Regions:
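Gly/Pro/Ser/Thr-rich low-complexity, intrinsically disordered segments predominantly at protein N-termini
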Residues: 1-126
């Protein structure tokens, strides 16, 4: 994940919402970070985990929902922090507003990429 040359450095939610839908970024403490496209191996792992989690929740009669990335999670307003974990489970439907999850999901999975392990192990430990 590389920092974009984008102003202002302390981006607001209103500015974030003006980005095109296919503009893949995360915002940490108001700073914008570009997200690279996932690899085939990454997507294969994501799909297997998604199917397994969804099946397990249904089998146990759970009411939680599994969401794959890209799906925004807003963790903070000022400074803005919006992330897109690779996979998340959300049980509290009140956190969902039709656009994103507001607050921490109940469970997240981040698939570590060889191209950016420091981001996955350090910055993304929100």
């Amino acid at each position: 994940m590389e920092a974009l040359q984008h102003q202002p450095q302390n981006i607001t939610l209103e500015q974030y919402e003006q980005f095109p839908e296919d503009y893949r970024v995360e915002v940490f403490d108001g700073a914008i970070y570009n997200m690279s496209s996932p690899s085939q191996a990454h997507q294969t792992i994501l799909t297997e985990l998604l199917v397994s989690l969804r099946s397990y929740i249904k089998e146990k009669g759970g009411s939680c929902t599994v969401f794959p990335s890209p799906f925004d999670v807003k963790l903070n307003d000022d400074p803005l922090t919006i992330v897109q974990p690779d996979l998340m489970v959300i049980c509290d439907k009140n956190k969902l507003d039709g656009k994103r999850c507001n607050g921490a999901p109940d469970f997240i999975i981040e698939i570590v990429s060889p191209s950016n392990p420091s981001d996955d192990y350090i910055r993304k430990l929100y």
